[in-house]
Structure formats: structure tokens, C-alpha cells
Amino acid sequence: MDPSMGVNSVTISVEGMTCNSCVWTIEQQIGKVNGVHHIKVSLEEKNATIIYDPKLQTPKTLQEAIDDMGFDAVIHNPDPLPVLTDTLFLTVTASLTLPWDHIQSTLLKTKGVTDIKIYPQKRTVAVTIIPSIVNANQIKELVPELSLDTGTLEKKSGACEDHSMAQAGEVVLKMKVEGMTCHSCTSTIEGKIGKLQGVQRIKVSLDNQEATIVYQPHLISVEEMKKQIEAMGFPAFVKKQPKYLKLGAIDVERLKNTPVKSSEGSQQRSPSYTNDSTATFIIDGMHCKSCVSNIESTLSALQYVSSIVVSLENRSAIVKYNASSVTPESLRKAIEAVSPGLYRVSITSEVESTSNSPSSSSLQKIPLNVVSQPLTQETVINIDGMTCNSCVQSIEGVISKKPGVKSIRVSLANSNGTVEYDPLLTSPETLRGAIEDMGFDATLSDTNEPLVVIAQPSSEMPLLTSTNEFYTKGMTPVQDKEEGKNSSKCYIQVTGMTCASCVANIERNLRREEGIYSILVALMAGKAEVRYNPAVIQPPMIAEFIRELGFGATVIENADEGDGVLELVVRGMTCASCVHKIESSLTKHRGILYCSVALATNKAHIKYDPEIIGPRDIIHTIESLGFEASLVKKDRSASHLDHKREIRQWRRSFLVSLFFCIPVMGLMIYMMVMDHHFATLHHNQNMSKEEMINLHSSMFLERQILPGLSVMNLLSFLLCVPVQFFGGWYFYIQAYKALKHKTANMDVLIVLATTIAFAYSLIILLVAMYERAKVNPITFFDTPPMLFVFIALGRWLEHIAKGKTSEALAKLISLQATEATIVTLDSDNILLSEEQVDVELVQRGDIIKVVPGGKFPVDGRVIEGHSMVDESLITGEAMPVAKKPGSTVIAGSINQNGSLLICATHVGADTTLSQIVKLVEEAQTSKAPIQQFADKLSGYFVPFIVFVSIATLLVWIVIGFLNFEIVETYFPGYNRSISRTETIIRFAFQASITVLCIACPCSLGLATPTAVMVGTGVGAQNGILIKGGEPLEMAHKVKVVVFDKTGTITHGTPVVNQVKVLTESNRISHHKILAIVGTAESNSEHPLGTAITKYCKQELDTETLGTCIDFQVVPGCGISCKVTNIEGLLHKNNWNIEDNNIKNASLVQIDASNEQSSTSSSMIIDAQISNALNAQQYKVLIGNREWMIRNGLVINNDVNDFMTEHERKGRTAVLVAVDDELCGLIAIADTVKPEAELAIHILKSMGLEVVLMTGDNSKTARSIASQVGITKVFAEVLPSHKVAKVKQLQEEGKRVAMVGDGINDSPALAMANVGIAIGTGTDVAIEAADVVLIRNDLLDVVASIDLSRKTVKRIRINFVFALIYNLVGIPIAAGVFMPIGLVLQPWMGSAAMAASSVSVVLSSLFLKLYRKPTYESYELPARSQIGQKSPSEISVHVGIDDTSRNSPKLGLLDRIVNYSRASINSLLSDKRSLNSVVTSEPDKHSLLVGDFREDDDTAL
């Protein structure tokens, strides 16, 4: 570098910029100024950074140049900063034909070249450049005859290596970034930081949680980059001080992808040796890319390893090493020693190769003509709207020509495209935008994982490695991410669960099994979600583990299976040769990835590429071989939800038990009557004990068949045995399996109660027979039959009720069609053939016919026909929806009239209905926080009840022997014919058994899940999708509801509110103004221009307007043009003759003090229409005040007052001038949704605080808030600050619900306690939101909170039922309330236990009576209370307010928003107004670029 050259940099603040057009204008104009080398203008920072020659320009002259363009420029720091330069020495080749002065003039015209010196004798050119603007490669491209003089560079580098290289080079920085969870985070950071001025390259590693940045320190500082990363929500700190690069391009790329080592600071490259060899190793035990990175980073640290490339797919590693220093066997052991030390390595080959000698002292210079292979990354872009292979070819053809694109593969079946690209030349966002520009909907996949490919350098390009020595025993273990990287998920249907103890039993035991990471069991849904390691365990084994616990288990879904996997039943196979024939034939077909045929089961499992081949093609191939093939039928029914099998089981069990119980009950009643009769005789006649015994024995049932065995006890025993052992067999099996795994549940309590009663009775009976007792013992043989009757009745009723709780989900599942009619069309859309196929065989792009009354089998787009479609069960929309060509249809909706042909766009699990079903199922599987308490309580319930039962037995035995009168007083049916001891024991056992019978953990376990299941189902039926029990429970705790503005409170689309006709000396008609303005704005791409054109076409009832020429846009001001050919349009509709009925318009006499209406026709143009007049031109100006003033027009105070009034209401006022006459004013605004004011009022009446949060300016925000009745507003809040604002509200102790569009507001939705995504239609898989409202209706926000409150109230009622039965019933059963006459028999306790579970489920079913309130039901009582707020009642907080601000710099999202924010006034901005601009409503995938809208308004 030559410091004397003196190139400076200055930063100038620029006010008045409103959009990117302003930026472009300043850069173009100032960039042409003599002496200006480079200029970069930032809209969000409102400044311009200029690199200039101080000999030709000064900061003051540059400031004045910007001022002259109509902007306000201010220099805050008058001291310019020096800019680093460098000198290149270029040698002229012998083939040079150009004159020296031509070379000099050519190079001096190049931006970034400050000086040139020519040495003809030495055939050398010394070029002084600014490295941040131009480089040697660009100089060579300008003059190909020049080549870099490496010798001169060596001398210069050796002379002042530290100084010059540090100044002229770039700096590499390693920064630790925390909080990243997925590759979307890395892409966001790379996209935003990579676009900052001075940042050359950036690579963010998710595994290492760090960012490697190559930047120019004179343009950006470390602190600025750190603040930018933290502004995105990721904590960042510098891991290592930045170092100036002294490396070539290859080394930089390698450095960016090499983890930081903790040893010496200076980086050196591993040398290449003359006897380098290459060895290939097979490595088993790698599971993920983290393993690959671990092996590569560890081996590359070895001193004698030149390079290593590890392939996860091929399980191999190719290592280049110095054969004289290390052997392949040593390398093999080194790989096996890499943490965690589980790799198995074998050597396959060794190839000898030679390379250049190393340079031990300094880095070898890389010749300039050696071009390194750049980084290659891979991104997946989801593409909607493709209908055929022509679309695929079109996208591939256009995108493949884009700069930086290496390859592209578009899949019609998967609706996505995989692009390999150079991240230094393009980005995923750019590619996505390019696809959208072609007319398709494109979004970046959440699963994008950058694939970094670095070319293996030749001997001329050695790799950079660390100087660290390799070590093994002291190595820091690498975090094992096997669970996250190598896990699969399956769903298992579980039957036989009765309470929360069963859930806890399954979860606890399965977590102990090797290979199972987590398990979540849903009692009500009867489903278990299991995450497991497929290398260790498979779903059938998991199901078997559950069956061993005593429950039924069936694998119902494998979450890893999806498109590309086919399971078929193949009939006609006789031997192994048939199997071989099918497998070999299929694997020869292109697109078949894997095929396995099992002769024993007659099943074929096939993996295929859906881009190349489809399931119908595979079936046809098998059938062509002479076999029959059909799809394995999947159970699409909701049989596991309606509990039909369980209902049948318990109904049968109840009837069997009842058959034996009725005689037992008859005997018991008979004995009770007789005991009462004898007690009366004893009381009246004062009979002795002997007389009582004789009287009892005279009864038929008390007669002894054998000594000690009465007829009564024999009959009771015979009736009890079948019930005890056959009716109770199910309970014995379940109790045994539970106890085997050291757990206890309701079945254990039942078995204990019945077994103790039966065993006690049998033992006492055998003892009496052995002793030949004359008095018959009192037994409990009547207890087991009566217990089992009430238990079976309770379970029967409980499962009936459970089936009712799942009706909503069952209805959704029943909507799924089973078959589809696929048709074949010719080129003229004439039907050629029809074919009925299973819905699983439908592929994307198929043409499907749907007849009247039929269900749509898949999501699709109508290509032919008109009809009305019933979507009520999916969206909650009661009225049928009209469908025409181009309309989208939803799977499961019903076609009412008219046949339709649709093109399938989403099939299988990707359909809207499948997504809704999946979401509701997962919601009903999840557990609410309050349920976790119940589950924990149930785990201790059974042991506690057993303890209470034993304690009751012992206490009553002790009380009986100490004070027999108590037992005698409260023992029902006591007679003096039995001994005291027997009476005490029987009474104690009766109380103990009753305690076991009445206790019911089931009611506690059912209280929450039944209510959650019914609540989520009712919500789904009403178009409110609640993602689980937690948001359902949390919503009732919400105290603050925060609304986004654009698209939530408002429609999000600008519309014309009012057109005023202004007259001075001449007048012009309303329709003529519309024709002129509509024609003029038809060339505008701005949302406001589009809104004006749309309005004009609607008012004029035409699709074609006049002709617009000489169209010009002046950013920040307005447009000018000339309009012709409108007279024919006006004459056609007879509007040019008379214009008496002017809609939404008035005429204003601007030279008078008052408005006055006019019905006169235009006087500017004569009413006679002729061919000559058709060619008449109108000079049109449309814009703001400043634009009119610039063009010499005077704005009267009355007109200015009109504009101010509109601006106060948050509208944009645009002036129209025709032929230099001010003749019209158009007011445009984003309109408030009709139900918004009512919804806000209802929320306030529910005791909730309502807040409006918007990025729009304060005046517009205040206007919208006043219209809907919101008194607290946060305006000008950037997207990155919305999260901070929500967090601030939460720190005040408030539970916050955030209502937004679910896309741009996703960070705030995730931060809020309850995120509500509104108006997303069929996009029901928004991860950030907790509640998804299918319909774009704000009253559904009210309904979701109301439903939550009703559900939580029902849960509390359920707990009251459960606790009453247990907390009150158990003490009664134990005899605590005997002094007041409350005594329970065991059968009574059993009936109470059964009633508790049934009552809880029936209580939850009351939620099915919930009806979402309608607009009319809300509107009538609120009519008198609703009123707009005055501006003085509204509190507006601007910006981030008092929350801490991480960075003054804006992120990419904020910059895009700012680019598109300028309000209607600022589009055409004059600095006096602060009105807002509204956006057009683009599709949801285009919100990130182009016509982006956050909740702000875009610039014209």
C-alpha cells in the first residue's frame, strides 16, 4: 500500500428517503460525481457512506450534492476516515496490441482504481486499488494481456508483511452464537449478516454454535456485527480475537469450515510431501453429520495428514497422508480413537501419489490464474402451483441459468426443488424470489441443511490445518447428539387402560427399555407416541413390551414412513423363485430404490422415488409378471376412537355378572327381611340367645346340609365362584401384570377387594365345617358378584361416554374418501377414460373427477366445472362455497351440484384434512399442566388406599375388642346368634373391603383428558384448532390480548375510500377522472396504484382502460404521464354527456369558503365524441402536495384541509391534476374488518386488556385504534422488537395472547403465552401458534378464549366430582361417620366407585353442548355500548419505548419492512404529513420479499 495516495471515507446522514428508489437514485447520481470511487446508501440507517478522492471532493461538496437532489444531508463527523489501498504490479504479456495510454484510460475509468503508473521498459504496470471495491481478477478481466507480477509481490510482502498484508487483506472472526435450534436459524443469520457492508463471507455452524465471518475492518466493526446478531435474538460473543488473513482463496474457504482449536494462535497449512499416499477406510458406527465433522476435524489436526474427506452415505473416509511418517494402520487406530470411541474402521485400499515439496518457512503463494472451486450449498424450496412436467422443465430451465446455480432438481410429486448453488453468488432467498417471479408460490423449507462442498486442492493449493498435535485420551468428549439425529417416531394404539396409573405404568416401564428415548401416553385417545432408535428397537417390539404389561397394543402409524414407501399384498406366489422374479424385475425399473418380498406373508415392501415412478406403475409391473397385487388396506375408520370393542366386552361382562348377581341379591334381600323380622321378635318377646339360634336354624336357607354348611352359604358360594374366576379373570390378569412390574392400579384394588372377601368367606366356611359348628358363619360370598356387576356396569357406561368424547375427531376421520376417480384427458380436455383407484394411489398432478354429492379425495385446484361445495365440517363455514376453474378445494369437503375436474396438489398425509386430523390427534394426546398433578397423585393413590384399608381393619378390630358396644350399635343386621369375635372380625373386614371398593383413581385420571378431548374436538368443529391441553388451559389465564394491525384488525389490502372532484374555473366529471386516473395508474406496480386502478375498473364496469404514455415515477412525490383513448370508453357508457349520479364523490368550489355540490358535467372536454377526440391527450399528475407545488400548481387551504382530515383518519390523500388543473382528490386506506370493533368490545367485557401493536406510524395506529375501541397502542414497533414488547408485558406479571397472521409475527406468537394465528385458511401446521383459526374472523379469537374458559371450568367440576367420591367416600366407607348413621356395605362402595368415573365422563360431555356465539348474539346486547374512542383516550407508545434495545442497526426483516413502510403520504412524501400507507395483500409465501407486508404499510 502507498499511504500517500490519500483515499478517504465519509458518512453523511440523509433524511427524506422513503423507499429503495430513493436509495438507487442517490447511488446513481453521486456515484457519477468526479472523484467518488464508491457509495453505499442505507435506507434503515438513513445515511450514505462515500469513498472519495480528497483531491477532487470534500465532505462538504458531497453533502451539497445530496442536498441538491431534494434530500436533507448532514455531516455529523467532519473528520473523514482514511481508506486502505493496495498496489498491484502487473506484467504486460508479449502479445499486447493495445497502446499504453489505452490501458491507462481503461483502468482509470474503473471504480476503485485510484492511480496508475506505467513502466514501459520493464513492461510493468503499477495499479493502486481500493481492495474493498476492486480486486486483481477484475483488473485482469478488463485487460486480459496483464498478468500478476508474483515476484514483485513477494518482495513487497517480505518487506512489510505484517503492515501491508494486514491493511490490504481481510479479517477472519470466529464468534460464538447461542440459541440456534435449526438450520433456519443459521440461514437467517447468514442472510442478514452477509448483506452488511464490509462482510465478505459468513458461514454459521449449527453443530459448533459459531459463526465464521470474513470482513473488512475499515467498513464494519466486530461490535456492529455482534449487535446485529443479538438483535435477531441470538446471544453472541467473540470466541477469539480477529486475525488478518494472509491466505489465498482456497485457504479462506477451508478456514470458514474448520472448527476452532484451542491451542496456538497462528494458523498454518499442513504441508504436502513428495511421497504422499491416499488410503480409503470403511467406517461403521457413524450416525449423523456430527460424526463426520468430528472425524474430519480430529484427523485434519494430525501433522502428517494433508486432507481427509468422510462420507456418511458411503461409510468411508479418504485420507491423504505422508507415508514416510505414518502408516495406514496408525490412521485406522486414530479414527477408532475419535470420541466417543465407538467407530469400527477397516482399510480397503492405498494409492501412492506424489506432490510438490513443502515450504517450511512461509505460505506458498497461489497463482492468480488458479481459480478455486467455491463453496457449494444445497437448499430445498417448496413450490406450489406446479401442475405438470412442463412446469418442472420451465422452472429448471430458468433457475439453472441464474448466476451461482450449479444444479436444480424439481420434483412435481413432492412439490419442491433442490438447488445446489454458490453462496458467494446467490442465496436461497434470491432463488425463492426468482421462482415466485415465474408465477409459482415458493417457500424455503424448514429442513434446509447447507451442504458445504470444498474442492480437494491440487498440489498447488495445500489445505489449511491446525498445528495442534493429535491426542486421544485427553480429548474433550463431543456431545452425543444421537438422540436428536438418529431417532424415529411411531404411534401405538393401546387398549385396556383405565386410569392414570395405567399411563404411568406404561411410561415408566418403557423408558427403561434400551433404544427408547421418550414416550407419551394419552389415556383418552388410547394412543402412545414413542421416540426410539431404529438401530436398536422397532415399533413391533415396542408394542410387544406394552402387551407384556397387560395392555393391548397395535402399531397404528410409523411417523417415518411417507411418500416413497409402498406396502403391497402379492398373491399367486408359490416358491422362492417367484420372490426372486418379482424383486429382480422391480429393481431393474428406474426409480425403484428398494424391494423386499416375503413369501410367508405374501407382502412386498417397496421404496421408490415418486418423481420417477408411482404406486400404480409398480402394481401394474407386478401384475404384468402374472401375480395379483393390491394395496395393504389401512384402517381409515375411527374404530379405536369409538371404543366399540371395549363397549362390547364390558356389556357382555355386565350381563354375565348380572345373571349370577340377581339370585345373590334376592338371597341377600330375603335374609335382610328375615333378620329384621327376628330382631323385632327379639325386641318384643325378649327371646334368649338359644331361642334365637333355634329360630334361625328353622329357616330354610339356614338349614345345614352338612355341619357348618347352610343352604344359604352353599348357594352363595356356587353363585360367587363363576363370577369370581370367570367374570374376574380379566382383572386378575391385569393385576398380575401390574404387580409384576412393581406398580398398582385400579385393577389391583378390585382384585384385592373381591379376593379378600371370597378368601375370607371360604376360609371361615371351611373352619365352621371342620368344627361342625351349629351356628352358620356370616360370609361375604354376596360381595364379589355385586362388586363385579357395578364395576362392569361402570366400565360399560364409561366407554360409551368415552366414545362420545371422540365424536368430533371421528367425524373428521370419516370425511376422508376411500376412492378417487382418476380421468385421462386429451389435449383438448376431452375425457378419454376413467379409473377407480384407492385414495392412497392418487399422485400429485392426477386429474380427478368429483360428481355431485361426492367427497373430494385430495386437495386440488379446479380445472373445469362450476359447483357449490360444503366445507362446513372442515372450516366451520356454514354456507356452501362457490368453486370455479382456478379455485382450490379441500379434501373431505362435499361437492353439492355440478361435476368438477380437479388437479391433485396435495395427497396422502399432506392434505388439509389429514393435517387437521393429525393436529387434533396430537392435541388430544398432549397433557394439560393440571393433568400432570392428577397423574402424579394417581401414582401414590393405590398404595395409599391399601394402607388405609389395612389401617381400617386393624382399628376396628382393636375398637371392637375394647368396646364391643360400638360395633354392636352400628353393625347393620347384627344378631346375637353369632359370637362377639366373629362379629368384630366380620365388621372390620366389611369396613376394610368397602374402603377398597369405593376408592377410585380413575375419576381423578379422567377429569382432565376427557374435558380436553371434548374441548379440542368442539373447537375443531367450529374452525378453532387448539394444539393440545396446555394452550387450552393457558388461554383462560390470559389477561392481555395483543393484536397485529395489518391483516388482523384490518383487511390488509388498500382500497379507495373516497373520490372528491375539485373545480376551479372548469369542471370535470367524476367518471372522467376515474377513467384518466385509472389509465394513468395502470402502469404503476405500487399497491396504492393497483388499488386505484382496481377501483376505477369496478366503477366504470370495464376491464380495459385508455392508453398511457410517457409514464414516469418520481420516488417520494408521485407520477406523471399522458393519457389518451378514454373518450370511447366514456361514450360507450354515455358517461361523458351527463354525470348526475356521482357515487362517493362531491364537487368543491375551491375559491369559495364552503363546499358545494355540483352536478354539472365536465367543461374541460366538449361532450361531442369523435374520432379526432379519441386521440386527445391529457397531461396527468398524481401525487402529494410537494409534487403539485413542484409542477407549479397552487393548493388552496380548503383542499389542504381536506387532505389533513383524511390523514388524521389514517388515510392517504392523493391529488390529481389534469392539464395543469387541480381537479381531484383520492383517499385510500386499509379498511377495518367489520367484526373488529365488536370483537374488541367483547374481549374488554370479558375483563381482558386489549393492545394494538404495529410497525405503522403513530397517526395511523391511533386512527385504527379509535375505530375499533383500543386505548393502548404500540406503534412503529419493528418485527425484532415485538418479541421484546411481549416479554415486557409478561415481566409485568401478565399472561399474554398474541393474535397475528402467523408468518411475520411468528417470533412474537412463539414468545406469547398463547399464540393465535388468524386467517391462515388451510395452512394449519404453523409451528409458532398455539391456536390456529381456520376462518379469518376476529370473533373466533373471542370464541377460543371463551371455549378455554368453559373447558377449564368443566375440568374443575370434574375434579370436584372425583374428590367428593374419594375424600368423602373413603372416610364414610371406613366408618368415620357411623355416629351419624352413615354406614356403607361393600356393594354400595362399588356402586359409588362406578358412579364416580361415569359422572366425570358425563360431566365432560356437557361441553358438547357448547355453541360458538354468532355475530348477532354478540352484537345485539353490545350495540348500545360500542363507540369509537376519541384520540385523547388513546395512549400511543412509539417504537420499542422503554424496553431495552439491542442494536440501533436493523436486521434484514426490519430493512425490508422499512423499505416498504412509507405511508401514503410518504410514498409521495412531503415532510409535513405522517399518514400511513397500506399494502396489497400478497399470498402468504411472498411476504418476505417484493410486496412484503409485516403489519406495516408499503411505499409507493
Swiss-Prot record:
TM segment ranges: 654-675, 715-734, 742-762, 782-802, 937-959, 990-1011, 1357-1374, 1386-1405
Binding site for Cu(+) 3: 288, 291
Protein residues bound to Cu(+) 1: 18-19, 22
Enzyme category, top tier: translocase
Entry's disease: Menkes disease: An X-linked recessive disorder of copper metabolism characterized by generalized copper deficiency. MNKD results in progressive neurodegeneration and connective-tissue disturbances: focal cerebral and cerebellar degeneration, early growth retardation, peculiar hair, hypopigmentation, cutis laxa, vascular complications and death in early childhood. The clinical features result from the dysfunction of several copper-dependent enzymes. A mild form of the disease has been described, in which cerebellar ataxia and moderate developmental delay predominate. Occipital horn syndrome: An X-linked recessive disorder of copper metabolism. Common features are unusual facial appearance, skeletal abnormalities, chronic diarrhea and genitourinary defects. The skeletal abnormalities include occipital horns, short, broad clavicles, deformed radii, ulnae and humeri, narrowing of the rib cage, undercalcified long bones with thin cortical walls and coxa valga.
Name under which the protein is recorded: Copper-transporting ATPase 1
Reactions that this protein is recorded to catalyse: Cu(+)(in) + ATP + H2O = Cu(+)(out) + ADP + phosphate + H(+)
Impact after mutating residue 1308 to D: In MNK; impaired copper-dependent trafficking from TGN to post-TGN compartments; subcellular location restricted to TGN; impaired copper transport activity
InterPro entries: ATPase_P-typ_cyto_dom_N, ATPase_P-typ_P_site, ATPase_P-typ_TM_dom_sf, ATPase_P-typ_transduc_dom_A_sf, HAD-like_sf, HAD_sf, Heavy-metal-associated_CS, HMA_Cu_ion-bd
Expression tissues: Widely expressed including in heart, brain, lung, muscle, kidney, pancreas, and to a lesser extent placenta. Expressed in fibroblasts, aortic smooth muscle cells, aortic endothelial cells and umbilical vein endothelial cells (at protein level).
GO biological process entries: ATP metabolic process; blood vessel development; blood vessel remodeling; cartilage development; catecholamine metabolic process; central nervous system neuron development; cerebellar Purkinje cell differentiation; collagen fibril organization
Residue spans, topological domain Extracellular: 676-714, 763-781, 960-989, 1375-1385
Region (PDZD11-binding): 1486-1500
Active site: 1044 (4-aspartylphosphate intermediate)
Topology in membrane: Multi-pass membrane protein
Function: ATP-driven copper (Cu(+)) ion pump that plays an important role in intracellular copper ion homeostasis. Within a catalytic cycle, acquires Cu(+) ion from donor protein on the cytoplasmic side of the membrane and delivers it to acceptor protein on the lumenal side. The transfer of Cu(+) ion across the membrane is coupled to ATP hydrolysis and is associated with a transient phosphorylation that shifts the pump conformation from inward-facing to outward-facing state.
Impact after mutating residue 1044 to G: In MNK; impaired copper-dependent trafficking from TGN to post-TGN compartments; subcellular location restricted to TGN; impaired copper transport activity
